Amino acid sequence: MISSDSRSSPGLARWAESYEAKCERRQETRENRRRRRNETTCRQPGKVLRTQHKERLQGARQLQFLKRRNLEEEKKGQAREQGPSSKTDGGTGQVSILKESLPGANKASFPGQQETGISSEVFPALHHSSSGIQRDLGGHHASHGRAFPPQDSDIKKPHRQHRGTQTKAEEALPTIKNDASQQTNCGVAVLDKDIIQLSEYLKEALHRELILKKKMVILQDLLPALIRASDSSWKGQLNEDKLKGKLRSLENQLYTCLQKHSPWGMKKVLLEMEDQRSSYEQKAKASLQKVLEEKMCAEQQLQRAQLSLALAEQKCQEWKSQYEALKEDWRTLGDQHRELESQLHVLQSKLQGADSRDSQMSQALQLLENEHQELQTKLESLQGDGEQQSSETQDLQDQLKKSEEEKQALVSKVQQLQSLLQNQSLQLQEQEKLLKKDQGLPVWNPKLSLDEVKPEGTRKEKEEELRDQLQKETFQLQVKENELQCGQWLPVLMVVIATALAVFLANKGNLVI
């Protein structure tokens, strides 16, 4: 059963469309995508030509280097180890096509050369053209072998699922036993097996379409190389025709020369040509020696450059490590800078608080100075009052002495009164004991005479009077003691105030200093 894809149908209208409409819409989107031009910044023609030219030059240099170093056998062994996957069909096909299109490039046998025996060194243009074509073919083959190895391997050996045109529904779904069916919007019943087969066919078609797109991309990349190869073959054929014409003209000239000149003259000409040939060979040997020397120098320079490159890489790594260390130091310094900035803000806030406190302290100092002046005035007034109070204290001391004498007299009187009270209390206790004894007798007359009652009443009155006198005298003594205490504390207070003022003035002098 095909589930509706939420990514392909974001709107509510697509939910209501039929299966055929969905298929048509998807086919249209595929066609639109397929018709797009597959040109990007990495597939620009000028850039491709430049890269291919560079790769061609590099491949030719590498081949010469390998020939001189005798490293072709190692390269063949590596190619054998890589297996047949590295050998692409596109490259071999291209080389075979170009070889077929150039029939005269490799067949460089001319009748004039066989008859006259002239060596091929006299005509180097033909060899240069054929070697250039072969280099072009090798460069194209190498560039395409490097650029598209996985795609060519896919084309050579496709997967088994891509070979067939149909898939077996029984192998895909072995668990389905009952043929279930579904009803479409038109009312036609369709089996689930058919729907699954259709979905598999669609998947297979999409996969084949992707493979065809890849093949089209590869062919598009191979097309400019084939065009260039055809141009080079056409130019080679033109050069070959030109060379053939030159050879014919030279043969005609030689024939005319043979008819005009004698064999002795021809021998002289041949001797001169041999001398020229030997001189040319010597010059060629000298040039080859120079080239070999230049090659050795270039190899030495290359080795030096490689050594300098290795040293530069080591230095680069060292600089990288130093850069990373400096980066970490910079981060730590940044953190420290931020911490110091935060501390500076805190100190600025503290300084502002200290300034505000300083202003408050200055205001408080002015207030204290004002209070000091007021206290000085008060001290002067208090000193005058102290002199008066000293005279008053002397008077109070005299009064205190008098009051102490009176107090001693009163104390003696109180002691006498207390002794009298004790005696009276003892007498009363004895009388109570006697009364209790009289009550215990069998005959008791409760009536008392007036003479006995009166002394008891007089005693009670006397006791009350004595108590009142004691209370009055004690109250007077307490009042006098309080007055004496207040009189004693006044000079003490004066002394304390004077010491406080002296301490304040001393502290003020220290602050001013």
From Swiss-Prot:
Expressed in bone marrow, spleen and thymus. Not detected in heart, kidney and liver. GO terms for cellular component: endoplasmic reticulum membrane; Golgi membrane; lysosomal membrane; mitochondrial membrane; mitochondrial outer membrane; plasma membrane. InterPro entries: Cent_Immune-Sig_Mod. Its main location: membrane. Residues 266-488 form a coiled coil. It is a single-pass type IV membrane protein. Keywords: Cell membrane, Coiled coil, Golgi apparatus, Lysosome, Membrane, Mitochondrion, Mitochondrion outer membrane, Transmembrane, Transmembrane helix. The keyword Iron does not apply. The chain crosses the membrane at residues 486-506. Residues 1-485 are cytoplasmic. GO terms for biological process: antiviral innate immune response; cellular response to interferon-alpha; cellular response to interferon-beta; positive regulation of interferon-alpha production; positive regulation of interferon-beta production. Residues 1-96, 130-171, 381-402 are annotated as: Disordered. Residues 386-397 have a biased composition (Polar residues). Residues 507-513 are extracellular. PANTHER family: CENTROSOMAL PROTEIN OF 170 KDA (PTHR15715), TRAF3-INTERACTING JNK-ACTIVATING MODULATOR (PTHR15715:SF21). Adapter protein that plays essential roles in both innate and adaptive immunity. Plays a crucial role in the regulation of thymocyte development. Mechanistically, mediates TCR-stimulated activation through recruiting MAP2K1/MEK1 to the Golgi and, thereby, facilitating the interaction of MAP2K1/MEK1 with its activator BRAF. This is TRAF3-interacting JNK-activating modulator. It comes from Mus musculus (Mouse). The lineage of its organism: Eukaryota, Metazoa, Chordata, Craniata, Vertebrata.
